[in-house]
Amino acid sequence: MARVKRGNVARKRRKKILKLAKGYRAGHSKLFRTANQVVMKALCNAYRDRRRRKRDFRRLWIARINAAARQYGMSYSQLMGALKKADIQLNRKMLAQLAVLDAPAFATVIQTARAL
């Protein structure tokens, strides 16, 4: 069987990892082994946190809606139940935006939900 020399393949693999490690400090951007470790960890963290970000934003929206709803004498769960009953289809992101940026509109939404 013929001998396979891995020069080009190995160099490409290492360059790819070192390119991903650009901007890291000291050996983390210069040495392949340490760069490989920190890049793998960074990619794992990025993958996990892309999913976590969705949870975190939902928690933030719920906290904002709850705080705004309590100013009008309603809890978050009461408000969401009333909105569902009134068939008002605003998602949590929209409600949080209204609560923060347009309080009168949020008050109108609460009054509409409360009326039904």
UniProtKB/Swiss-Prot annotation:
Cystine crosslinks: none
Q: Which Gene Ontology terms of cellular component type are present?
A: ribonucleoprotein complex; ribosome
Q: Which GO terms describe its biological process?
A: ribosomal large subunit assembly; translation
Q: Which GO terms describe its molecular function?
A: rRNA binding; structural constituent of ribosome
Which keywords does this Swiss-Prot/TrEMBL entry list? Ribonucleoprotein, Ribosomal protein, RNA-binding, rRNA-binding
SUPFAM superfamilies assigned? Ribosomal protein L20
Asked if the Swiss-Prot or TrEMBL record annotates the protein with the keyword Ribosomal protein, the reply is: yes
What domain of life does the native source organism fall in?
Bacteria
Pfam families attached to this UniProt entry: Ribosomal_L20
The record's annotation in InterPro entries points to:
Ribosomal_bL20, RIBOSOMAL_L20_CS, Ribosomal_protein_bL20_C
UniProt xrefs under PROSITE patterns: RIBOSOMAL_L20
Check the record and name the PANTHER family matching this protein. Answer: 39S RIBOSOMAL PROTEIN L20
Protein family:
Belongs to the bacterial ribosomal protein bL20 family.
Q: Which NCBIfam families match?
A: rplT_bact (TIGR01032)
Q: What does this protein do?
A: Binds directly to 23S ribosomal RNA and is necessary for the in vitro assembly process of the 50S ribosomal subunit. It is not involved in the protein synthesizing functions of that subunit.
Instruction: List the HAMAP family.
Output: Ribosomal_bL20
Q: What is this protein called?
A: Large ribosomal subunit protein bL20
Its lineage opens with: Bacteria, Bacillati, Cyanobacteriota, Cyanophyceae, Acaryochloridales
